[in-house]
Amino acid sequence: MKKYILIILSAVVLATTSCDDILDRPQLNTPTDGTFWKTEMDARLYANGFYRNYFVGYADGWTTNYAPLRGYSFSDDLASTGQQSSFSNSIPSTLGSSNTGDLATYQTQYVGPTWNFTWIRKANVFMERLEANMKGNVTEEAYNHWHAVAAFFKCFSYSRLVAVFGDVPYYETSFANSDLEAMYKDRDSRVFVMDKVYDMLKNEVLVNIRTNDGDNTLNRYVAAAFASRWMLFEGTWQKYHGGDQTAANKYLQLAKEAAEIVINSGKYAIDTPFRDVFGSQDLK
C-alpha cells in the first residue's frame, strides 16, 4: 500500500512542478498579442505591412498592377516583328479576337482588385488591437494617428472593391474563420459602404493623420490626395448613373475639401520638372 501511495504522491509532485512558469519564456522572434502592441513602434511596424499592397515600390520584386503605362508595346509607339501584340490583344475588334487567333488575352489580364477581404480584415485587426492594447499606453495624439492610418487603408480597400464590384459586404470588425454567417453575409449597398468610407475619411483620416511622419511614410496630404480621388469617382458615379444624388453631392464636396488640403499645403506642384526626378541630390 505504501508503494502505491508513494507512486501517487510522486505523480502529483511531478504534475504540479512540471508546469512551473519559470520554464516558460516568450518567443523573441514571433510577436504575439501579449508581447506586441506595447509601443508606437509596434504600431508603425504593423502599418508598414500595408504599404506593399497599396503603393508601388514598397514590395520586393516588381509589378505592373495599376501602372498607367504597362510597357510600350501596349501602345502604338512600339512594334515588335511588325506586330503590336499587347495592343491588339488588349483592345480586340470583336470579342474573342486576337492576332494569334486564340482567345483574346485581355480577358486574363485584369490587374485590379479581386474579391478579397484580407486587407480589410488586417485593417480591422489593427484598429481593434490599438483600442484594446495601446490606448492609454501611448499619447492620445499617437493613438489617434495610428487609428486613422488603419482607417485609411480600410477606406483604400473598400474604395477599390466598390469601384469594381459595386455592392460588397461591409465588415465593421474582424471575425473568426468559423463564423460562417459573417463570412457569407449578403452584400451591402454601395452607398452604405461608401458612406462608411466617407465618415472615416471626413471625421478621422483627414483630421488625425500627421502632416509629417517621416520620409516615405503616409501623411495627411497623401491621404487627402487619395480621399479626393475616391470621393470624386464615387460622387460622379452616383451622379451620372442615376444613383443617390444626395450622396453624390456630399462625396463631391469632400473630394473638393480633400483636394484643398493638398493645394493649401503649398508642398506640391501640378508637375515635377523632369530633370529633378532623376537628378535630385537628396531624392526629395
Segments predicted by a language model, with ranges:
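Short linear capping/connector segments at secondary-structure termini
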Residues: N29-T32, T139, T173-E181
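Conserved, well-structured interaction surfaces
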Residues: R44-N48, R52-Y58, W62, Q84-F165, ...
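Membrane-proximal, proline-rich intrinsically disordered regions
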Residues: C19-R70, N249, F274-F278
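Short, surface-exposed recognition loops and adjoining beta-strand edges that mediate ligand/DNA contacts
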Residues: G34, G61-G82, Y171-T173, R210-A225, ...
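Short, well-structured active-site flanking segments
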Residues: P26, V162-T173
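Bacterial Sec-dependent N-terminal signal peptides
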Residues: M1-L28
